[in-house]
Amino acid sequence: MMTYEYILVRYGEMTTKGKNRSKFVSTLKDNVKFKLKKFPNIKIDATHDRMYIQLNGEDHEAVSERLKDVFGIHKFNLAMKVPSELEDIKKGALAAFLQVKGDVKTFKITVHRSYKHFPMRTMELLPEIGGHILENTEDITVDVHNPDVNVRVEIRSGYSYIMCDERMGAGGLPVGVGGKVMVLLSGGIDSPVAAYLTMKRGVSVEAVHFHSPPFTSERAKQKVIDLAQELTKYCKRVTLHLVPFTEVQKTINKEIPSSYSMTVMRRMMMRITERIAEERNALAITTGESLGQVASQTLDSMHTINEVTNYPVIRPLITMDKLEIIKIAEEIGTYEISIRPYEDCCTVFTPASPATKPKREKANRFEAKYDFTPLIDEAVANKETMVLQTVEVVAEEEKFEELF
């Protein structure tokens, strides 16, 4: 019985790139290779406009499951490779059609003749291939407008690809082509989604989390580690910086009027994150802010908070409502982790009436009464850094180390 031997990957947005296209293709190939480490028999060939993954006996469903999370892939097809002879093409088309799962009642044939010297024209091939499928199946009809299955045939010199099963990729651009950002990862619903959407634009992320023991628990810290771990499904690794924030928060609570404590806290977070960004050669800061969602996310608040950093602040969720954000969180697997009931540092010192229209002048005047620089230095110096990779990759590396 014929089985799928190849997966053909289409790039999508990457095809609009000019001189940098080879870099994008190379990065995507590297990311796919990393994602498919578990499958040693696979061979990957990336051309200018498509990627060919030769399965060599590996499970196509298991490989497909991992491919769907790789940014830079628009769509991919499970494919069979047959000699460019009419009888072989007919047999391959039938075999591919029979492997399609689900309630299939209609189909159509699409033929692309890359090899123009093939002895039959497209309009001659359609009834030959379609007729062979009809002769060898029951209760199946042709529907050229809205078929359940599109049997695609690509004819080349010497061989042809037969494809039925088309699947959607993650879209976007390959992670790594767009530089690096620091993302503020709170442990809530929004910030992991912001990290995901940033990666979708080809940007590598490192996460910064502020925790305030004993006011925040080890479980709250573990929750953030688990979120960062979940995000590794979409990239090679996530570096997580855990910043001790207790002394900064206690000082803000003591020295700053309560209405401005939230604003000043966010400004301190920006200052610390900027320092880490400089150390790590990051080019921007990403946050999970959504306009008007809470008091610290008004335009006035953002204007006042932005003052303390020269780095671009990327806010992927800025115009989304909460339901839109939750939907993405559920799709990417972070929602159930985010709703674990453990407080983060943003909630333990929440003022009763935070200013919704804070002014830069006031924030600067309040901050000038106390020298926060030593506390910022201490927080940066005492941060804990860990590098997280997908569980499977870690398991493979541990297995390799056990051999020595």
UniProtKB/Swiss-Prot annotation:
CDD domains: PPase_ThiI, THUMP_ThiI
Gene3D superfamilies in UniProt: 3.30.2130.30, HUPs (3.40.50.620)
GO cellular component: cytosol
UniProt cross-references to SUPFAM superfamilies, sorted A to Z: Adenine nucleotide alpha hydrolases-like, THUMP domain-like
Top-level taxon of the source organism: Bacteria
Residues annotated as binding ATP: 184-185, 209-210, 266, 288, 297
Any matching Pfam family: ThiI_fer
The name this protein goes by in its record: Probable tRNA sulfurtransferase
Upper taxonomic lineage: Bacteria, Bacillati, Bacillota, Bacilli, Bacillales
Gene for this chain: thiI
